[in-house]
Amino acid sequence: TLAHSIEQESYKQNYVLKYSFTSIDIGDPRTYHLITNNYVDGAVILGRCDKSLLSYLKKYFNYVIYVGINSLDARYDQVLCDSFAVTETILDHILSLGHRKIAYIGEVENEERFSAYRRILEENGLEIDERAICNVVMSTDGGYHGAWQLLKKTLDFTAVFCPNDLTA
């Protein structure tokens, strides 16, 4: 996993990974206590987080690195996946299989993979049926609810694009 790779590379560079927190841990007061009362040089954030959390971390750490898909409008080092290129590769494959009516299940707002989905379908001259776009949180529950929404509408689609594994 990405977290394991970061841990290995840190070790190679003579750094020690002292703590690992999930998004659930960040809301816990004990986590804030650990952050504020222990000397730690830096933090690596994997995946989405809001600017207030980044600002908080920047206050307590000399180095903050964000790793994710959507770029942040912030002055932090960022390691980004080219989500447009990834989406293009996936949709090119789906299109090569003959699919022309492709539904979407996932987040829409500030989501580069959704923007790529729209643009790639338009560039291929395909009509986008707005009813076949299910704006749901990208999670297993979101994917489940999005699939139910599509099935209840009895739409004519032959493929579904989900931006991540959990949603799929």
Predicted regions and their residues:
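Bacterial carbohydrate/catabolite-sensing allosteric modules
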Residues: 2-17, 30, 41-42, 58-66, ...
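Short, flexible, glycine-rich and Lys/Arg-enriched loop motifs at helix boundaries
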Residues: 1, 22-35
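Active-site-adjacent beta->alpha loops and helix N-cap segments on the catalytic face
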Residues: 51-59
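Short beta->alpha connector loops
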Residues: 22-26, 45-51, 108, 166
